[in-house]
Each structure stands twice: as structure tokens, then as C-alpha cells.
């Protein structure tokens, strides 16, 4: 049904190509490990210190839940970063004689210096606004203020236009900027 609708709107046919911002593995399959690395950089999770039953979690308002829910729908598809002019392709090839560990370290360093992208910024905001995740907000903000952080975003807003889940990515990026401003002032005056 979806293909029929796409072909109906494009009677001349459609062309399928792999994403251009990620290394191609084969055919239409791309290596999205860079996206997962950005999630690691911003610590897009809530650390747990055990698996035992700790009872009910912190209570929160319906309004707070409704703000965060759209951000939780991200499926890390990569459409937002594919459309982003600031998210440049980073393709590192293994040098001859280079061990797998050396190659991986060099690749991770290149990923860590490049723009995070809207998906990672949005996920950082999701967890910073979570009652339990808030305790690690400063670590996430530190990552967002580092190389390739929020300051690289040129506000082209292509990300929000192409997101298949209609996630308010530009709103998340703006919130990240506001949180970073407060964080930087706190760091400046807490010395």
C-alpha cells in the first residue's frame, strides 16, 4: 500500500540509494555505528545500580510525560542526520598493518570530534528531563558542549522536516541550548 502511494505520487518512478552520510556496507545497508557512538557520548540512558525491586519510581505530572513521550519515539533511523548539512560523512578506512583495536580507536576519535546530530541531542534532552535521569544531566551537558556539540547546529531545520516520527527535534536542540547556557553559568560561578 505504501509503495503504491509513493509510485502514485511519483509516476516517473523512484530511486533507492543508501544514505550518503554513513559508510556503505553493501547495497542499501550502511554502517550506522557513528549514531550509536553519539548516543554513548551523550550517555543516552539512565544508569541502574541493581536489578532488585526498588518500588515505585518518582511520580511526575502528565504534562511532563507528554513533553518527553515524542522524544522517546526515536528509532535511530538516521533520517535527521542524513538531511542535516552540518552532519558530514566521516568514513575512516583501516590502514595496512593497523590492528583492529587501533582502527577502532581512531574511528571513535573521529566520531567524537564530529557533530552529534539531532537524534543524540534529542535523546540527551529526553534523559535530562526524566526525574531519574536528571542526576546525570551535567555529564550529558558536558558532552553537548564539547567538540561537535550543540554549537555546531546551524538551525537548518531539515531534521524536523524529514523525521518519520515527527519528533520535535528543533525544540530539543533549543532546549539543549538553554540548558547549556545555565550549565555554563553554573560552572563559571561555582569555581
Ranges and model annotations:
Residues 16-191:
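Ferredoxin-type iron-sulfur electron-transfer modules in oxidoreductases and energy-metabolism complexes
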Residues 1-20:
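Hydrophobic/aromatic-rich structural module bridging two neighboring secondary-structure elements via a short loop
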Amino acid at each position: 500500500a505504501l509503495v503504491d502511494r509513493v509510485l502514485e505520487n511519483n509516476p516517473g518512478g523512484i530511486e533507492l540509494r543508501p544514505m550518503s552520510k554513513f559508510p556503505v556496507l553493501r547495497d542499501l545497508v550502511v554502517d550506522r555505528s557513528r549514531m550509536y557512538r553519539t548516543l554513548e557520548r551523550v550517555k543516552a540512558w539512565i544508569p541502574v545500580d541493581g536489578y532488585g525491586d526498588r518500588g515505585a519510581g518518582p511520580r511526575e505530572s502528565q504534562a511532563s510525560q507528554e513533553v518527553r513521550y515524542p522524544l522517546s519515539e526515536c528509532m535511530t533511523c538516521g533520517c535527521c542526520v542524513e538531511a542535516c548539512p552540518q552532519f558530514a560523512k566521516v568514513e575512516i578506512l583501516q590502514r595496512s598493518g593497523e590492528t583492529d583495536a587501533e582502527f577502532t580507536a581512531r574511528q571513535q576519535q573521529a566520531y567524537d570530534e564530529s557533530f552529534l546530530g539531532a537524534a543524540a541531542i534529542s535523546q540527551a534532552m529526553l534523559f535530562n528531563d526524566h526525574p531519574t535521569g536528571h542526576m546525570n544531566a551535567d555529564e550529558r551537558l558536558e558532552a553537548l558542549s564539547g567538540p561537535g556539540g550543540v554549537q555546531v547546529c546551524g538551525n537548518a531545520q531539515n531534521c524536523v522536516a524529514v523525521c518519520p516520527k515527527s519528533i520535535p527535534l528543533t525544540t530539543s536542540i533549543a532546549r539543549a541550548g538553554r540548558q547549556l547556557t545555565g550549565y555554563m553559568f553554573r560552572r563559571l560561578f561555582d569555581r
